[in-house]
């Protein structure tokens, strides 16, 4: 296309010698040679420098990207490590909490057993004390009943029973008779009640 334009301009130049658009042939050749030299110098000196600078820059960028990727992998590995440590810590905390709850339940159960044993011992002591007190009361009541019976027998008979053994025998027989007599469970209500 440029060639066609130059040829067209040359033909016109032949007709019009003083055309502004068509330069003289010598100038055109010198201009083309100068342009070729400039392009040659560019490819000989400047282009290799540009390629070298471009390659260095690309290498720096790739190195930066590699470092960034390596740092990202390291950060990801650290993140995974932290996550696993966190999960481990959580499971450890759950295990400790379960152990504490189990120990708490065991302590409560031991305390409950201990309290039940103490309550049973207190009941046994109270029952034993009640039995002893009842026996004491029964013995005291029997003595008093014996004395009252003796006094009553003395009044009824009109004379004092002279023998101690005989007195005791009489009291014991009276008390035995009381023990054998049927005891009412409840007092019957009278007609006025």
UniProtKB/Swiss-Prot annotation:
Lineage: superkingdom: Bacteria
Full protein name: ATP synthase subunit b
Membrane topology, as annotated: Single-pass membrane protein
Function summary: F(1)F(0) ATP synthase produces ATP from ADP in the presence of a proton or sodium gradient. F-type ATPases consist of two structural domains, F(1) containing the extramembraneous catalytic core and F(0) containing the membrane proton channel, linked together by a central stalk and a peripheral stalk. During catalysis, ATP synthesis in the catalytic domain of F(1) is coupled via a rotary mechanism of the central stalk subunits to proton translocation. Component of the F(0) channel, it forms part of the peripheral stalk, linking F(1) to F(0).
Subcellular localization, as worded in the UniProt entry: Cell membrane
PANTHER family, per database record: ATP SYNTHASE SUBUNIT B, ATP SYNTHASE SUBUNIT B', CHLOROPLASTIC
Main location, first listed in the record: membrane
Example GO molecular function: proton-transporting ATPase activity, rotational mechanism
Similarity comment text for this entry: Belongs to the ATPase B chain family.
One GO CC term, this protein: proton-transporting ATP synthase complex
Parts of the chain that traverse the membrane: 24-44
Quaternary state and interactors: F-type ATPases have 2 components, F(1) - the catalytic core - and F(0) - the membrane proton channel. F(1) has five subunits: alpha(3), beta(3), gamma(1), delta(1), epsilon(1). F(0) has three main subunits: a(1), b(2) and c(10-14). The alpha and beta chains form an alternating ring which encloses part of the gamma chain. F(1) is attached to F(0) by a central stalk formed by the gamma and epsilon chains, while a peripheral stalk is formed by the delta and b chains.
Pfam family, one: ATP-synt_B
Keyword field: ATP synthesis, Cell membrane, CF(0), Hydrogen ion transport, Ion transport, Membrane, Transmembrane, Transmembrane helix, Transport
């Amino acid at each position: 296309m440029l060639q066609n334009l130059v040829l067209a301009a040359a033909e016109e130049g032949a007709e019009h010698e003083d055309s502004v658009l068509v330069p003289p042939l010598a100038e055109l050749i010198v201009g083309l040679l100068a342009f070729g030299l400039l392009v040659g110098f560019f490819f000989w000196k400047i282009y290799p420098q540009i390629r070298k600078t471009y390659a260095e820059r690309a290498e720096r960028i790739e190195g930066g990207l590699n470092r960034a990727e390596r740092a990202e992998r390291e950060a990801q590995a650290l993140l995974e490590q932290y996550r696993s440590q966190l999960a481990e810590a959580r499971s450890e905390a759950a295990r400790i909490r379960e152990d504490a709850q189990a120990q708490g339940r065991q302590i409560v159960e031991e305390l409950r057993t201990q309290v039940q044993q103490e309550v049973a011992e207190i009941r046994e002591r109270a029952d034993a004390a009640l039995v002893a007190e009842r026996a004491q009361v029964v013995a005291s009541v029997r003595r008093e009943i014996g004395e009252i019976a003796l006094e009553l027998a003395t009044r009824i008979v009109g004379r004092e029973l002279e023998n101690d053994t005989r007195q005791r025998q009489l009291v014991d027989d009276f008390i035995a008779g009381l023990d054998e007599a049927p005891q009412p469970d409840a007092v019957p209500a009278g007609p006025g009640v």
